[in-house]
């Protein structure tokens, strides 16, 4: 029996009592949110419902990495700088790399070079870590270098110019694969040099606006030619692309890479390519 009191649809029955909303909920056997949606539609409150996006694990990790990076100390005066010094590197990066004094790994605590790799849109794509034990690479039975994805795979598959941008962009810009190689090239040639991390990212690197001369510091890779192949593919793509480039130089040592050259000395070879001028 419905009791017309207070306009709330009050009712009473042998099974209980309540207001109108409770009656509808009991008789329709539907979740409360579905009932509210149907009632809204019946009385004309039909509006667009916007779903709040679920934060992805990559987004969450990216925020944590950026927050941590902002709290880390600069390299100078740390065992991270001492490690680079032991590799002959005294010209330290201006940006993108900091020192983490407590880097956990497999239940142990190390230190690390904590490096951020971004793409040509400025989006953070990867966290690169070099695990250290004092002023030496950590002896963990495998590579002391770690690369962690900070974007979804469907974004990373199409990301271009991923690099650890350790120095400001300049009209003459260098790229190399590894951090130590890039810092060695910077120290030897006084060229702002970025680390593309590996040969795959080097192939996809395209110069930003304003770069007139790209210098690619290639690894020798005597048994595979991987470094030189990536350097030449990068050079070709940049020469064919629409940009401000005037020339591309490819440098490589007779052995190993430019950090080995810095420490032990070596001969360096060079190829120079000039961009074809557009016909007016």
Report residues per predicted region.
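Phosphate-handling DNA/RNA-contact segment within nucleic-acid enzymes
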Residues: 105-209
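Terminal peptide-recognition signature
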Residues: 3, 13, 24, 84, ...
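Short, basic/aromatic recognition patches
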Residues: 89-108
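TOPRIM fold recognition
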Residues: 11-14, 170-173, 179-280
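Short, solvent-exposed polar/charged micro-motifs at secondary-structure junctions
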Residues: 1, 47, 103-108, 137-138, ...
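Non-catalytic accessory segments of DNA primases and related replication-initiation nucleases
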Residues: 1-86, 222
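Residue-level detector of short coil/turn "hinge" positions at structural boundaries
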Residues: 31-32, 91-92, 247, 268
């Amino acid at each position: 029996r419905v009791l017309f009191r207070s306009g709330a649809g009050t009712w009473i029955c042998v099974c209980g009592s309540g207001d109108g909303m409770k009656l509808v909920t009991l008789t329709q056997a539907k979740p409360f949110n579905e009932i509210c949606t149907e009632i809204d539609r019946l009385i004309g409150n039909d509006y667009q419902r916007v779903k709040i996006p679920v934060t992805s694990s990559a987004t969450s990790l990216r925020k944590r990495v950026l927050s941590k990076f902002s709290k880390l100390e600069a390299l100078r005066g740390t065992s991270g700088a001492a490690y680079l010094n032991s590799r002959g590197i005294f010209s330290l990066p201006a940006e993108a790399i900091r020192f983490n004094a407590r880097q956990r790994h497999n239940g142990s605590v190390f230190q690390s070079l904590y490096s951020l790799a971004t793409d040509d849109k400025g989006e953070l794509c990867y966290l690169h870590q070099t695990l250290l034990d004092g002023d030496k690479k950590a002896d963990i039975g495998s590579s002391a270098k770690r690369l962690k994805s900070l974007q979804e795979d469907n974004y990373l598959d199409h990301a271009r110019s991923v690099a650890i941008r350790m120095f400001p962009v300049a009209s003459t810009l260098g790229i190399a694969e590894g951090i130590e190689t890039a810092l060695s090239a910077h120290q030897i040639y006084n060229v702002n040099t970025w680390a593309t991390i590996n040969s795959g990212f080097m192939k996809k690197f395209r110069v930003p606006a304003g770069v007139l001369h790209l210098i690619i510091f290639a690894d020798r890779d005597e048994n595979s030619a991987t470094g030189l192949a990536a350097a030449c593919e990068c050079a070709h793509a940049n020469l064919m692309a629409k940009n401000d480039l005037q020339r591309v130089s490819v440098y490589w040592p007779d052995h190993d890479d430019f950090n080995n050259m810095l420490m032990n000395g070596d001969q360096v070879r060079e190829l120079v390519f000039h961009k074809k001028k557009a016909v007016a």
